[in-house]
Amino acid sequence: MTNRIVLAYSGGLDTTVAIPYLKKMIDGEVIAVSLDLGQGGENMDNVRQRALDAGAAESIVVDAKDEFAEEYCLPTIKANGMYMKQYPLVSAISRPLIVKHLVEAGKQFNGTHVAHGCTGKGNDQVRFEVGFMDTDPNLEIIAPARDFAWTRDKAIAFAEENNVPIEQSVKSPFSIDQNVWGRAIETGYLEDLWNAPTKDIYAYTEDPALGNAPDEVIISFEGGKPVSIDGRPVSVLQAIEELNRRAGAQGVGRLDMVEDRLVGIKSREIYEAPGAIALIKAHEALEDVTIERELARYKRGVDARWAEEVYDGLWFGPLKRSLDAFIDSTQEHVTGDIRMVLHAGSITINGRRSSHSLYDFNLATYDTGDTFDQTLAKGFVQLHGLSSKIANKRDREAGNN
């Protein structure tokens, strides 16, 4: 049986050099798989050809933008998915989709191994490998950058010794990962927590201080899904792309945070996610109007746990599936419109309307037309505070308060 390695191929130096390296290591063929997740930049046909030129037996490019938006970004919107209340899981939600297509390619080409280019210090090694274990445990996993101390210098030396066609350029000091949902920047001078990020690291967002005129936008949802912007029907992908442009032009969606990595270390990360942040903020605002108080309280805890599961690489796990089912059940009435102003790096919600709204004007108003029966409040207050009152009485008598 021929050994076949299915490689998560980015088109960069490391995974290009990995093709001939892996071929030699297992004496077999390499199937390179690349996904277009809306990351922009290089033409994907060029990426495909580079893999073939490096010696791949097959090079597959998958246009997965709509699939990514509908099946990975949309659940993140419904879950208000923010790890540590800030990070909208830009890289974390893309890894299970890459895993899915690598496993499919493994079945198509009778793959025996699967490989990725992650190091041993990051979260992505976990996301990839747990995903492979969950979906096809028969594939043997190879991680050359981690397992064989693969460095950039070693990669270039191997390429020169083996005539691998690579384009050497001045190396960016940063590690960058991007897709339509956002952009992640790390390492380089950012590893010193006191160093402020310079303007040149940003690509999805303009400087919030530019003074652009405010941009007012209306985002409409049906069952928690964005369906139109300013009255124009959009797909989820189109909604993300348009808000990337509009919110990005206002400097919305920049994050600078110290993140608790799964492997136990803290890491400074810079993110740009204008469309993601705008959609999640709008969705949260609509949930405030349409979800009952106790359910909303409980969902906030579920949302946080969902983000942790996804961040930790457990997309295919049983808890994540159960959390998905709960979250989906909460979205039945999350239908309506949110109006927001994008300006100078901020989002201001200034309008909400929904045919499923739980806001009752006549109960909320303090003016004429008030239907709230305030005579019921006194008894409610007494009963609400009764258990606390009894406990404090006991503690006072015991001299503890």
Curated annotation (Swiss-Prot):
Residues engaged in binding L-aspartate: T119, N123, D124
InterPro entries: Arginosuc_syn_C, Arginosuc_syn_N, Arginosuc_synth, Arginosuc_synth_CS, Arginosuc_synth_type_1_subfam, AS_cat/multimer_dom_body, Rossmann-like_a/b/a_fold
Sites where the protein binds ATP: A8, Y9, S10, G11, G12, L13, D14, T15, T16, G117
Cell compartment(s), UniProt: Cytoplasm
Keyword ATP-binding assigned: yes
Source superkingdom: Bacteria
Family to which the UniProt record says this protein belongs: Belongs to the argininosuccinate synthase family. Type 1 subfamily.
Entry protein name: Argininosuccinate synthase
